[in-house]
Amino acid sequence: MKAFPVICLGFAIFSSSICVNINILQQIGYIKQQVRQLSYYSQSSSSYVVVKLLPNIQPTDNSCEFKSVTQYNKTLSNLLLPIAENINNITSPSPGSRRHKRFAGIAIGIAALGVATAAQVTAAVSLVQAQTNARAIAAMKNSIQATNRAVFEVKEGTQQLAIAVQAIQDHINTIMNTQLNNMSCQILDNQLATSLGLYLTELTTVFQPQLINPALSPISIQALRSLLGSMTPAVVQATLSTSISAAEILSAGLMEGQIVSVLLDEMQMIVKINVPTIVTQSNALVIDFYSISSFINNQESIIQLPDRILEIGNEQWRYPAKNCKLTRHHIFCQYNEAERLSLETKLCLAGNISACVFSSIAGSYMRRFVALDGTIVANCRSLTCLCKSPSYPIYQPDHHAVTTIDLTSCQTLSLDGLDFSIVSLSNITYAENLTISLSQTINTQPIDISTELSKVNASLQNAVKYIKESNHQLQSVSVSSKIGAIIVAALVLSILSIIISLLFCFWAYIATKEIRRINFKTNHINTISSSVDDLIRY
């Protein structure tokens, strides 16, 4: 018997443990798609980012006057003015009016909120609460304004950490400042205008929701990346103690931002960022699988296994991940959603085909192929597989559930009219003849269920007929039983009567005999008495 390798995605601990057998599962249409590292997160703290939107330009020998900076400053003021006004309206009650609501001593301008949900009011409360820290950070505006560094850490008296970020300053430092003395003022002004214009266009696009109401519209991922620019990794490294890349954290939406203050004179924006606490479980892998139909026992079927499992060491669980955030390499969850698997399911995952359960398929709209690392895994018994380069039809034997097509067998593949280019070799070096019993196939599809229901209804009708017949038989048996009981009772009574009669006759016989004996004795005594009397007379 040929030995088949087993691929364990986790870490082997015991030699007898159960591992996921990727190769065997792929042969029955259960294909591994993605493996992610499991991490847990919670929103625990906040950090502040001071975004300086107007860059510093080093003075030049020819004292160039950059008109582009003046125009950029004017346009940026028009962009930030509505945001600043909205923040002031929310954080301050309307003048001359007593109609405002207080949350734990915090005054909120109700008119600025308008019709707001509970979550939006909570965001407004958070905005007002952040004003204290924002003002403390803004008090350091002179040191922030004077710096020429792209990322600058500042601390105020309470050791509140803030990070000053100048996304456009990084571009100025690396490109513009090195050329100030080597180019004419007009060329530099045009080049600076181009850079500032592009940055301004990007800000206008991503901050459009904040122009309506910054308290009710959190900063999007695009806005955060635009604000931070190329300094995103440095900011993430300064605020988070994790080895996960900044792109993964931002794409998962774990860092949420909110504008809490705008300083128009200095062109500074203070953004409150909710910083998560991230903990990675090193030996926990979440594996996504994709199921396609397979040809088993002369019919199209699909395996019944979960689409996503969690593997820790050599143990597996079902993992729905309904409340998790997924990226390409990580899955971030607030809690563990693992669900236990049955022993049969674990054995099936380990490659024991006899423990697997399949469901039959009725209908033509079904997943019958999947692309896997540059190859194609398809059910070529349920769709037309035609290789165009070289040109030949691909046949799938009866003992193969699916067919793996790689570069060695075909370069251009057509599946029911869809053309694919094969670019990789398959890493599967063996194929197993599958033997699956009929008892492993169940019906779960709607069309199959309707068919089975009709069969069940027919069986129920037959059962009702049989029940009626059995009731009739039971009724006849019941009447016969009553008659039999009466006869038995009569026989018993007759026997008892006969026994009583015999006993009475026997008693009468004994009594008569005793009476006769007594009479005999009496007569005998009388005779003796008479004889004695006669003797006395003589």
From Swiss-Prot:
It is a single-pass type I membrane protein; Single-pass membrane protein. Residues 20-486 are extracellular. The record marks P95 as: Determinant for fusogenicity and cleavage efficiency. The keyword Transmembrane applies. The keyword Coiled coil applies. Belongs to the paramyxoviruses fusion glycoprotein family. Homotrimer; disulfide-linked F1-F2. Interacts with host LAMP1; LAMP2 and LAMP3; these interactions promote the cleavage of the viral fusion protein F. Residues 1-19 form the signal peptide. The inactive precursor F0 is glycosylated and proteolytically cleaved into F1 and F2 to be functionally active. The cleavage is mediated by cellular proteases including host FURIN during the transport and maturation of the polypeptide. Residues 508-538 are cytoplasmic. This is Fusion glycoprotein F0. It comes from the Viruses. Its main location: virion. One of its GO terms (cellular component) is membrane. Class I viral fusion protein. Under the current model, the protein has at least 3 conformational states: pre-fusion native state, pre-hairpin intermediate state, and post-fusion hairpin state. During viral and plasma cell membrane fusion, the heptad repeat (HR) regions assume a trimer-of-hairpins structure, positioning the fusion peptide in close proximity to the C-terminal region of the ectodomain. The formation of this structure appears to drive apposition and subsequent fusion of viral and plasma cell membranes. Disulfide bonds join C324-C333, C348-C356, C380-C385, C387-C410. It holds the Pfam family Fusion_gly. Residues 128-156, 452-477 form a coiled coil. It comes from Mumps virus (strain SBL-1) (MuV). Glycans are attached at N56, N73, N89, N182, N352, N427, N433, N457. Keywords: Cleavage on pair of basic residues, Coiled coil, Disulfide bond, Fusion of virus membrane with host cell membrane, Fusion of virus membrane with host membrane, Glycoprotein, Host cell membrane, Host membrane, Membrane, Signal, Transmembrane, Transmembrane helix, Viral envelope protein, Viral penetration into host cytoplasm, Virion, Virus entry into host cell. The record marks R102, F103 as: Cleavage. It is found in: Virion membrane; Host cell membrane. One of its GO terms (biological process) is fusion of virus membrane with host plasma membrane. The 2 coiled coil regions form a stable six-helix bundle. Residues 103-127 are annotated as: Fusion peptide. The lineage of its organism: Viruses, Riboviria, Orthornavirae, Negarnaviricota, Haploviricotina.
